[in-house]
Amino acid sequence: MPAVYKRILLKLSGEALMGDAQYGIDRTVVERIVVEIAGVLQLGVEVAIVVGGGNIFRGMKSAGDGMDRVTADYMGMLATTMNALALHDAMRRNGVVSRVQSALRIDQVVEPYIRGKALRYLNERKVVIFAAGTGNPFFTTDTAAALRGMEMNANIVLKATKVDGIYTSDPFENKDAQRFRNLTFDEAINKNLQVMDATALTLCRDQKLPINVFSIFKTGALKRVIMGEDEGTLVII
């Protein structure tokens, strides 16, 4: 059976990279994520990734603690670049060819974001890892994922989290919480379900770009989503 999606935008939160730790990058977790990505590449799927930085630095929290918000957001963007390099290195060790592009210029470390080059890399079956969010303060990496998904002509945005979908309430606190198999964008926004921030949701809704929220910690979940199986929660128009 062929994959349902030809090109995906995978949103990896920084928290997903730290596993059960309280901070930093868990190399074992990163290696396992790379193996999952390699599996979908073998299906002929083209993969672009937007990575968060919350495992290293949380800009909004620091701003709430008194730091200038713009400074805090730029620090968060640098944290995403560290995560992107960690992913890139793990891919190299596993034989996956990837390129890192940053919305902030750090030319001695990573390439600047150039849409045409990113599209060419995807056509060449290289994984493209986008760092530094949108390059602008006040915008989350969720919004960056929506933006890059549209710019890369992705068929879907896949948000990889610690939870296997969107629930009626927090499944860690309520064992009776029910997983939604499907939601509309308006339902997600009106019910204030924590899918993505409102800006990202609205962008995806307006461009008719579906989102699937799934657990990156479930072995094979990424492949099952790609194959169109009942995995995670699909958010559509």
From Swiss-Prot:
Pfam families from the UniProt entry = AA_kinase
Pathway the protein contributes to:
Pyrimidine metabolism; CTP biosynthesis via de novo pathway; UDP from UMP (UMPK route): step 1/1
Describe the protein's quaternary organization and the partners it interacts with: Homohexamer.
Activity regulation text: Inhibited by UTP.
GO biological process terms on file: 'de novo' CTP biosynthetic process; UDP biosynthetic process
Q: Which Gene3D superfamilies match?
A: Acetylglutamate kinase-like
Q: What class of enzyme is it?
A: transferase
Q: Which UniProt keywords apply?
A: ATP-binding, Cytoplasm, Kinase, Nucleotide-binding, Pyrimidine biosynthesis, Transferase
Task: Identify the gene encoding this protein.
Answer: pyrH
**Function description:** Catalyzes the reversible phosphorylation of UMP to UDP.
Q: Cellular location of this protein?
A: Cytoplasm
Q: Does the keyword ATP-binding apply?
A: yes
Q: What is its EC number?
A: 2.7.4.22
User: What protein does this entry describe?
Assistant: Uridylate kinase
Residues annotated as binding UMP:
53, 73, 134-141
Q: Which GO terms describe its molecular function?
A: ATP binding; UMP kinase activity
The protein's annotated catalytic reaction(s) are: UMP + ATP = UDP + ADP
> Family, per the entry?
Belongs to the UMP kinase family.
Amino acids binding ATP? 11-14, 54, 58, 161, 167, 170
Please verify whether the record's keywords include Membrane. Answer: no
